[in-house]
């Protein structure tokens, strides 16, 4: 049986791998001037990190999170039919998103003591969700994101959105083809009453709505705004709106965010039905869509002022966002663009006889030590076959070493496009190559 990748996963090779690397480079170039520093968290966390942070009632925790068990613990789970008897440190999961893990790092290491400098971090990591694989939805996918803890001011919300749109611009998006949606989800003071209003609205229309929405009425009624059923969406269009139920503090926070965005020239659309799928969001939420690309949201985020406390820390404001690599790449391609990284020009060193391989080996090492991408023959090909291989790997130059050239202390340097050819001194081969790349 031929080995195959798991369903819902992709191999990042060639141009796609270079695109992922380029996205990470762009992320560093955009986020670091704002004071953000790179962070990497474990792919495996204790389940409670996500249950407390994302929310027990969310689809991510209930339906999509991959659980991880060692051999012995897996046997116990199969035998007992539950993992509740395992110790917390034995109940593990693959991270489905980045924020909860970063917050766990902050809480565990006390990185935002009261009155300290805010904690700013960005990440580029693989995430895992047990979703039904389809276009733009994978079981292992990649995200670039930022987390800003210790910044309650609405200016931080606006600055995150400004960073996000600048990131899309650097990726190669025409921002006029993107749509930024914003909303406020209120906070612990005003959202509970609103949640009850939406719950009652769904119950009043239960016989008209899908099974999933009826289930959500008890667990997470606001998620009904995200239902993909057209009839449910029509019904939810008449539901009470958070904007009509904001407390004075949340309303003023939201208005200030909009004023900052207006001052920065950021175009946005207010969407009073916009909710995020994770329970930790408070106040400002935002998403970026690529209409016409067929991939839905390509990124989003918001404020999460209660998450640090949920993870066992002291009350600390937070805000952040994440961008899906695979979806962003699909959207770019739909718009006729790409994220292909510029490859360094390649040099191929060919030998005119097996007896010259040692000399070719020395030349390749010298070129590589100088940072020049260099290929050579390792299969005993003929000179003609080496020329074909040089063309196949996209070499800009081919260096040909024959017995006569070696005796004269020279090497032929040939441009693969123009076919211009010169003899260069072996003692000066690096400079000769650089002049022609």
Regions found by a protein language model. Name each.
Residues 1-437:
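TRNA-recognition modules of translation machinery and tRNA-sensing kinases, especially anticodon-binding
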């Amino acid at each position: 049986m031929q080995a195959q990748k798991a369903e819902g996963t992709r191999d990042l090779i060639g141009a796609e791998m270079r695109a992922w690397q380029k996205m990470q480079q762009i992320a560093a170039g955009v986020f670091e001037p704002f004071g953000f520093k790179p962070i990497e968290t474990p792919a495996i966390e204790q389940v409670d990190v996500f249950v407390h942070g994302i929310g027990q009632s969310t689809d991510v925790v209930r339906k999509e999170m991959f659980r991880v068990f060692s051999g012995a613990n897996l046997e116990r789970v199969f035998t007992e039919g539950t993992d509740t008897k395992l110790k917390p440190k034995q109940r593990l999961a693959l991270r489905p998103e980045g924020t909860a893990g970063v917050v766990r790092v902050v809480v565990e290491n006390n990185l935002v003591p009261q009155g300290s400098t805010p904690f700013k971090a960005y990440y580029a990591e693989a995430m895992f969700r047990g979703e039904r694989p389809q276009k733009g939805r994978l079981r292992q996918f990649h995200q670039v994101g930022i987390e800003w803890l210790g910044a309650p001011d609405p200016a931080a919300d606006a600055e995150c959105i400004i960073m996000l749109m600048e990131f899309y611009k650097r990726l190669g998006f025409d921002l006029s083809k993107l749509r930024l949606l914003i909303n406020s989800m209120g906070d612990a003071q005003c959202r509970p009453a609103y949640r009850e209003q939406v719950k009652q609205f769904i119950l009043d229309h239960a016989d008209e709505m899908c099974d999933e929405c009826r289930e959500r009425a008890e667990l997470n009624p606001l998620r009904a705004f995200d239902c993909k059923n057209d009839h449910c969406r029509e019904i939810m269009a008449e539901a009470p709106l958070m904007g009509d139920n904001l407390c004075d503090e949340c309303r003023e926070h939201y208005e200030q965010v909009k004023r900052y965005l207006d001052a920065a020239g950021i175009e946005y659309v207010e969407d009073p039905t916009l909710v995020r799928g994770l329970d930790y969001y408070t106040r400002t939420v935002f998403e970026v869509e690529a209409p016409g690309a067929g991939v839905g949201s390509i990124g989003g985020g918001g404020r999460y002022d209660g998450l640090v406390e949920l993870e066992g820390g002291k009350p600390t404001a937070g805000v952040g966002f994440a961008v899906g690599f695979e979806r962003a790449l699909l959207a770019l391609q739909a718009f006729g663009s790409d994220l292909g990284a510029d490859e360094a020009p390649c040099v191929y060193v060919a030998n005119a006889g097996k007896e010259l391989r040692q000399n070719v080996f020395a030349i390749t090492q010298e070129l590589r030590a100088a940072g020049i991408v260099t290929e050579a023959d390792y299969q005993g090909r003929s000179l003609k076959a080496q020329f074909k291989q040089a063309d196949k790997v996209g070499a800009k130059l081919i260096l040909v070493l024959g017995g006569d050239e070696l005796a004269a202390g020279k090497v032929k340097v040939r441009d693969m496009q123009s076919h211009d050819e010169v003899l260069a001194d072996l003692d000066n081969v690096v400079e000769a190559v650089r002049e022609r790349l």
